[in-house]
């Protein structure tokens, strides 16, 4: 459980770092206004630009697919995996339908989440083997 939780934190940090590096606007943003706000490091209303303003990669897709992949490898239970996969799919669709992310931003987030989920599971597995 500790490895899973630390993986969630690591996954979130990776997402924040990528958002700050890529600085891709969300689809509902006016590209011109977004560029001006970034240039002046200011939102309309004088609050600073935060990582949450950026859309690439989708943090929700990344986190949900991280959990799904980790749980798949940890439990190897098809019913639980299907439940998590269904919830993850609904979350990804919701992010697109509500215009919070483009399809590409969601796909990239999902891929990164899958990769980190497998990496964290493998790391946890090696730690358990070393304890024996």
Predicted feature descriptions by range:
Residues 1-14, 106:
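Interfacial segments of alpha-helical transmembrane regions
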Residues 5-6, 29-34, 46:
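Acidic, polar low-complexity intrinsically disordered regions
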Residues 2, 19, 28-32, 106-108:
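Generic marker of "main functional regions" within proteins
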Residues 34-132:
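Membrane-embedded catalytic cores of phosphoryl/pyrophosphoryl-handling enzymes
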Residues 8, 12-29:
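Transmembrane alpha-helix/helix-exit interface in multi-pass inner-membrane proteins
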């Amino acid at each position: 459980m500790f490895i899973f939780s630390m993986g969630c934190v690591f996954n979130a940090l990776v997402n924040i770092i990528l958002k700050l590096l890529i600085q891709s606007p969300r689809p509902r943003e006016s590209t011109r206004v977004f560029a001006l706000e970034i240039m002046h490091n200011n939102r309309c209303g004088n609050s600073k630009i935060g990582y949450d303003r950026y859309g690439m990669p989708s943090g929700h897709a990344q986190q949900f697919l991280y959990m799904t992949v980790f749980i798949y490898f940890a439990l190897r239970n098809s019913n639980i995996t299907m439940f998590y996969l269904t919830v993850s799919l609904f979350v990804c669709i919701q992010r697109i339908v509500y215009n919070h992310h483009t399809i590409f931003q969601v796909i990239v987030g999902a891929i990164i989440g899958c990769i980190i989920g497998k990496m964290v599971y493998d790391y946890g597995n090696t730690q358990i083997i070393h304890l024996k």
